[in-house]
Design a protein with these regions (language model features):
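Metabolite-binding pocket within alpha/beta catalytic cores that recognizes anionic/polar moieties
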Residues: 1-123
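Generic hydrophobic/aromatic pocket-lining and core-packing "Φ" positions
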Residues: 66, 165, 181-184
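Non-catalytic positions within long, well-ordered alpha-helices that form the structural scaffold/packing
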Residues: 70-73, 169, 188
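Short acidic/polar active-site loop segments enriched in Thr and Asp
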Residues: 75-76, 174, 193
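Generic non-transmembrane alpha-helical segments
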Residues: 129, 133-144
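Active-site/ligand-binding-proximal alpha/beta "capping" segment
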Residues: 140-174
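Zn-dependent metallopeptidase/amidohydrolase metal-coordination segment
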Residues: 178-205
Length: 205
């Protein structure tokens, strides 16, 4: 079953049929989700910022969210990531299928392995098979998408300075946001295939 993690600008999915709210209990927090159907296929939707978009990026319980969508039965996850464009060729409304990330956050609880030594392979943090499926679906439906891009995750809630954006440009970053990490890392730790679509909202800084 597909899991959808939505962020800013995606508080509702009008195409979701037979929507039923539910709460998933995890050791970290209780997480509200919505079950429903998209084009006849079952999905589970998790709003990253909580109901009413009330949780800022640095206060999101990423462990609770990823464990909740996993325990709700999702076997793969596609997330949205509203982002600023670092690559000047990207314009508002463009979509980027992210394939790498740079984690510039600090202080976030970003692992399930606090009590054991485990080193998760992050060579391909975004599942290549799932990315291929997303790319194919976009092509078949005529939705333009840039296949590949490096996402910088900053801590928020403030925006980045021009100097920070220039620094990220020098290391090859494509887009910047505040919520992609540690979400992707936690999904990898659970062997949960995860893909993220960067939705460009503005030029960074």
């Amino acid at each position: 079953m597909l899991g959808l993690i939505t962020g800013s600008g995606f508080d509702t999915i009008s195409e979701l049929d037979d929507a039923k709210p539910e709460v998933i209990t995890t050791p970290f927090a209780d997480v509200p989700i919505t079950r429903g159907f998209l084009d006849g296929s079952p999905v589970v939707v998790l709003r990253r910022h909580g109901l009413g978009h009330r949780i800022p990026p640095h206060r999101i319980d990423y462990r609770a969210n990823i464990l909740a969508i996993h325990d709700a039965g999702a076997t793969s996850v596609v997330a949205t990531a509203v982002s600023g464009a670092i690559d000047a060729t990207l314009k508002p409304g463009n979509l980027v299928l992210i394939d790498q990330f740079i984690d510039a956050t600090h202080g976030r609880l970003g692992t399930f392995f606090d009590d054991e030594v485990r080193h998760t392979d992050m060579t391909e943090p975004y599942d290549p098979v799932l990315r291929s499926i997303v790319c194919q679906a976009a092509n078949e439906t005529g939705v333009p998408i840039v296949n590949g891009g490096t996402y910088v995750c900053t801590n928020g809630p403030r925006f980045e300075t021009p100097a920070e954006i220039r620094m990220y440009q020098t290391v090859g970053a494509t887009l910047v946001g505040m919520t992609g990490c540690p979400e992707v890392t936690l999904a990898r730790e659970l062997d949960l295939p995860y893909a993220s679509i960067g939705v460009i909202s503005n030029a960074a800084a």
